Amino acid sequence: MCHRQLISSWLSLVLLASPLLAMWELKKDVYVVELDWHTDAPGETVVLTCNTAEEDGITWTSDRKSDILGSGKTLTIQVKEFEDAGGYTCHKGGEVLSRSQLLLHKKEDEIWSTDILKEQKGSNGKTFLKCEARSYSGRFTCWWLTAFGTDVKFSVKGSRGSSDPSGVTCGEAERVSGDNQEYKYSVECQEDSACPTAEESLPIEVVVDAIHKFKYENYTSSFYIRDIIKPDPPKNLQLKPSVNSQQVEVSWEYPDTWSTPHSYFSLTFLVQTHGKNKNRREKKYELFTDKTSATVSCHKISKVEVRARDRYYSSSWSEWASVSCSEVSVSR
């Protein structure tokens, strides 16, 4: 959040903390209290102010405690552990006047907690967020893993460079798979003014705000689109007999999602045949080509696979597109 936004948030009031830097507004009426997490830490003093013009007859309650916590327009609490987090409500009579939610972001030995997301193996070591782009259109997908199946929420924001909090629009995070041990979430993002042919001077930054019950954490990934490119597999993979009856011609097309024109955004391809020959010995053959066809040997019990990557920049390879050699009739 930029300096101007912080000033605006605090002037809008409802909640004040001491010191100010120990707490900030995540969204309307939801606040994050940052805590040093060790035995002797004093915690943070938080002053809640009821958002009302009323002055008298106001009482305070908490979602997590049955007793009335105090009376008056303000309530001072000491936030030290998760029992102090949750919802705080001010009332007058039977009417709810305002409500605020406190989340805790804990720091141990100067390191912020990373308990909600699971580490994944990335290209440059371990990471919590993985992102891929299928082209240079500015559209990309990020995903992450968590062990929590319930009481978890995510929100995602993106930017082109940390100084500009806009420029990238991200959708709602969605669960795409899961079992009793691991759940995968993903989000689609789009750079608002993407120019596929322009040189990238600033990286894209993606921040995931993660909430599990009353715990808050955030995770950041910074990258250039060119570094997360992974094309879709080649499409329309076909085999036909060649003049040499012991070989076949395999042909394919660029994936529909790849950037155009293809003369500028060119792909290179890896063609691979593997299987067992008549003597049941494993055979594997690889061919690199910039064309969209190749001639290969293709035994009936083998298959042909083709994958693609950016011709001029060392992107990730696409997944394989494959076709069985049994689909073409050639004499052996």
UniProtKB/Swiss-Prot annotation:
GO biological process, one term: defense response to Gram-negative bacterium
Keyword Ubl conjugation in record: no
GO molecular function: cytokine activity; cytokine receptor activity; growth factor activity; identical protein binding; interleukin-12 alpha subunit binding; interleukin-23 receptor binding; protein heterodimerization activity
Residue span(s) of domain Ig-like C2-type: 23-106
Entries under SUPFAM superfamilies matching the protein: Fibronectin type III, Immunoglobulin
Domain of life: Eukaryota
Record key words, sorted: Cytokine, Disulfide bond, Glycoprotein, Immunoglobulin domain, Secreted, Signal
A single GO cellular-component term on record: cytoplasm
Disulfide bond entries: C50-C90
Glycosylation (residues): N218
Major subcellular location class: secreted
The keyword Secreted belongs to this UniProt entry's keyword annotation: yes
Position of the signal peptide: 1-22
Transmembrane segments annotated in the record for this chain: none
Subunit-structure text: Heterodimer with IL12A; disulfide-linked. The heterodimer is known as interleukin IL-12. Heterodimer with IL23A; disulfide-linked. The heterodimer is known as interleukin IL-23. Also secreted as a monomer. Interacts with NBR1; this interaction promotes IL-12 secretion.
Family in the record: Belongs to the IL-12B family.
Record's function text: Cytokine that can act as a growth factor for activated T and NK cells, enhance the lytic activity of NK/lymphokine-activated killer cells, and stimulate the production of IFN-gamma by resting PBMC.
Name of the protein this chain belongs to: Interleukin-12 subunit beta
Biological source species: Cavia porcellus
Phylogenetic classification of the source organism: Eukaryota, Metazoa, Chordata, Craniata, Vertebrata
Gene: IL12B
